[in-house]
Amino acid sequence: MYEQKVAIDIVKESFGDDVTKVFEFLVQRGKSSYKIINQSLSGKGGLTIKRIKQCLLVLIQHNLVTYEEFLLPLTKDEIEKLVPGEPLPSDSVYEAIIVNAIHRLRFPKFINYIKHSKGDEAAYILEELIDHGRLPMDLLIKQASQIQRVDTFEDQDDITKRFEDTFTKLIMDQFIMRAPRPRPVSDQETSNALSKEAKKVGGGGANGNNVGAHQKKDSDPFALPSVGFSSNGPLSSVDNSANDAESLEILTGKSSTTTIPSQPKKGTAKKTSAKPKSTAINTTATASLGRKRKSRDIYDEDDDEEPDLLVIEENVEINVNDHNSANKNSTTTTTTTTTKTGQHTLKKSKLDQSSSTTTTSSRQQQNGMDQQRIIDESRVLWTINYEQFIIEFKLKACYDFVTEKNNQQSGLLFNAMVKLCKRSIRSNQDSLTSCVYGENILEEYNRDLDSSKKMDKLQIEKYLSIMQASRPSMVTKMVSKSKQSSSSELGAYQVNVGNIIGIIKQKMVESIIKQKFGDNGLRVFKLLLIKNLLEPKQIAELAMIPPNECKALLFNMMQKNIIRLQEIPRSSDHFANRTFYLFFVDLPTIIATFTEDIFKAIYNTRERLKSELEPHKDALEKLTQLDEDQITEDQAKIYKKTDRITQTLLTVILNLDNDLLHLYSF
């Protein structure tokens, strides 16, 4: 309940009343089509149709609403009336994303983390995405580089190149991803989705493989742009000048005429124009060119190795002693060779013509594919991947727990293992990570350390055994009979991130229970976690609490939904004297209860902040328009008071959000 209230209040603070009405309707109603939204909100005194569309666009732009588009079923008459080339009639279903609205509380944490880990350029890029929600790559880099240029007064090309590198790193580290682009889906496609995923479509040759690769790339939200980037970063050293112009035009939004010299050197233009682009080669064209090139190379080798002397056939008779016959034979041989050479030249010219025709068509096809890919990449919108930030905060909490429980070396060892299997960790998943080998862990641990702080195999094996023996285990060693473990001398390990997060959540719950019910309440809670089901007398004896005080404490905790009561009757009439009353703890329910309490506290704190600032709203607006010399003493006191209250309440909200991260997002 309060989760929805907090999300609606955050949207209202950021986007105003009209957008909030649409978002609140989707939160309360759930998935709804545009027709239903329009009928519900466009009544008397409501929103206009145009305004509803604008509000939906704003919510989609800032990742607060997602949509699915479905093709409408048509009759035979309607199908016959369709105009070829026009899109099929469809309807969209919209759904609010409450979690993304809650994530807006954490934007200061996101910026602070990315600034310390990736640098100022990454922070500028993240701020632009926070302000605009979704942006194309060229516009994003252009706006972020302009901010950097104002601050440093550096050359624009150097700044743009640096931002391109940073943008690539953010994609590869999955902090930025492609915004989803849902396509219209029919009911038949929806029903056959599972069967289509199970089948692997080969595509019937090179064209099918190429199309399948592009479809896989489009479905991957972390795929790098195909033009202008490689897997290792921006393509800054490409020989083809046309590729340079196209890639720079995509990355910076500038025209290609600003980078290519107007008068290139002789031979350069000819060479670059004749060279096909390596970034977008069609497999089919390559195969056909390969076959032509093979037939040509046979004759090319003959031509290169052909001497200036005459080539004599084997069936020609040569008489060395008879000079006249030799001259006669040589004349005959010359005529024969001339005829063969003419046929050879004719075949070669025909092959050259066919090869040049194939090469020209393949170049045109490649140029068309490149141009289409440039257009497609320029339309791709990039947005923030909230899940990756939650994963980073989650791993930081695990590192702090391991360091606190063991020592600094165990924490560094945990970080080394996490770096090797980071891609298998999810923000809301408690399964084990992928396997990592002991040798790789040792290499990763010793990579950035001094020689005096490095570990050997015996030390790292000792630390891993300690982490495995802890309860619950932080790492799990694979069985020696498994293939992964037998291939490594130190064995293969998995990181138990789920176990560590479970203990962190339990510690958080225990701290809240101690604040609410004191040491006795905490002792009862931990006792029930260990023993599962206990009677009141057993709880009083084991927790060393007087029976009357223990009974009052139990009923107080049961009233707050901390513990629960289970009745086990010995007779069908459920008589009290013949019934066992056992208390137990349901930890997931307690976590859900405390999460709702935290949302309630955040909502009340935000309302308190509004009520504190409301009386001074007009005065604060006037203060922003005045100079420092014109501010009176009373106005300065009001400003200091409101600033102190604002900072205090915002700090409270951030601290509450830290607890919310552990209980709700992890």
UniProtKB/Swiss-Prot annotation:
In which domain of life is the source organism classified? Eukaryota
* Pfam families linked to this entry: HTH_9 (PF08221), POLR3C_WHD (PF22536)
InterPro entries for this protein: POLR3C_WHD, RNA_pol_III_RPC82-rel_HTH, RPC3, WH-like_DNA-bd_sf
Which key words are in the record? DNA-directed RNA polymerase, Nucleus, Transcription
Q: Per UniProt, what is one GO molecular function of this protein?
A: single-stranded DNA binding
Coiled-coil residue windows: none
The answer, when asked if Transcription is one of the entry's keywords, is yes
Q: Which GO terms describe its cellular component?
A: RNA polymerase III complex
Q: What is its main location?
A: nucleus
Q: List, as start-end ranges, the regions of compositional bias called Low complexity.
A: 331-341, 353-366
Q: Where is the composition biased (Polar residues)?
A: 253-262, 321-330
Name the Gene3D superfamilies on file: Winged helix-like DNA-binding domain superfamily/Winged helix DNA-binding domain
Q: What does this protein do?
A: DNA-dependent RNA polymerase catalyzes the transcription of DNA into RNA using the four ribonucleoside triphosphates as substrates. Specific core component of RNA polymerase III which synthesizes small RNAs, such as 5S rRNA and tRNAs.
> What family does the entry list?
Belongs to the eukaryotic RPC3/POLR3C RNA polymerase subunit family.
Subunit composition and interactions: Component of the RNA polymerase III (Pol III) complex consisting of 17 subunits.
- Protein name per the record: DNA-directed RNA polymerase III subunit rpc3
Organism of this sequence: Dictyostelium discoideum
Give the lineage.
Answer: Eukaryota, Amoebozoa, Evosea, Eumycetozoa, Dictyostelia
